[in-house]
Regions:
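Short C-terminal tail/terminal secondary-structure segment
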Residues: 2-12, 237-251
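Active-site helix of classical SDR
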Residues: 126, 164, 172
Length: 251
């Protein structure tokens, strides 16, 4: 998106500039859907993206369907956010792919899928969002990492998740310092085992002694509340917030 295109969209969306706006990827289910609801409950407008996502009857929620690993989708998301609401205050890079298998079993297609969504999706959309935030001198980016970036588990080999989610954690710290003096905060949350379609309840019996120290798996609401805490903590940047029931601290 060029500067001229951005200015044109801004002029057409002048009425929406007062309301804070969150862009959330992977917004159709699990943590993403919880975040859409959580930000709306706080009065934010939301632009939600997913590969498949239904339009919302709520005028404060706009959905953009598409593969976030593709630059064209990232551009469509930003065009929609600015065109409809005039700004982006917070970007939550929630879309992600997790695939557990032995390292030597990963295929070229697996690699392309995981790195495309986990890294490419972050890269293309965050570039565009920060460009808009720099024009206004404020903004917040939240990345979703994972405990596998800090703690390997032989029962669930996931080198590509560690590679990509660990990269997001490192990029979080780097961007936080790069843009701290320009009004933009960058943080991450690192969820442990959360009850989502990716980790259904019938899989918990196999956890055994891998159950988090708090004695339960996390809920979507636990992650949502952690991200909303970061939203309300203006002095926090470069933070990797572990929402894992003590997994990292306890091992």
């Amino acid at each position: 998106m060029t500067g001229t295109e951005h200015d044109t969209l801004m002029e057409g969306a002048a009425a929406g500039t007062a309301q804070r706006v969150a862009v959330i990827t992977g917004g159709s289910q699990g943590i993403g859907a919880g975040l859409v609801a959580g930000y709306r409950q706080r009065g934010w407008a939301v632009v939600a993206n997913a590969r498949a996502i239904k339009p919302s009857e709520d005028p404060g929620i706009v959905t953009v369907e598409g593969d976030i690993s593709q630059p064209a989708t990232a551009d469509a998301v930003m065009r929609t956010a600015i065109g409809r609401f005039g700004r982006v205050d917070t970007l939550v890079n929630n879309a992600g792919v997790f695939m557990s298998k032995p390292f030597t079993d990963y295929t070229a297609a697996d690699y392309a899928l995981i790195t495309g969504v986990n890294l490419g999706g972050f890269f293309w959309l965050t570039q565009l969002a920060i460009t808009d935030m720099l024009r206004r001198g404020s903004g917040h980016v939240v990345n979703i990492s994972a405990t596998v970036a800090d703690r390997a588990d032989s029962a669930a080999p996931s080198a590509l998740a560690a590679l990509t989610k660990g990269g997001l954690a490192a990029a979080t710290r780097s961007l936080a310092i790069e843009y701290a003096s320009r009004g933009i905060r960058v943080n991450a949350v690192s969820p442990g085992i959360i009850q989502t379609p990716m980790h259904p309840a019938d899989s918990y019996a196999a956890l055994g002694d891998r159950m988090p120290p708090l004695g339960r798996v996390g809920q979507v609401s636990d992650v949502v509340e952690g991200i909303l805490f970061l939203e309300s903590a203006p002095y926090v940047t470069g933070e990797i917030l572990h929402i894992d029931g003590g997994q990292i601290a306890g091992h």
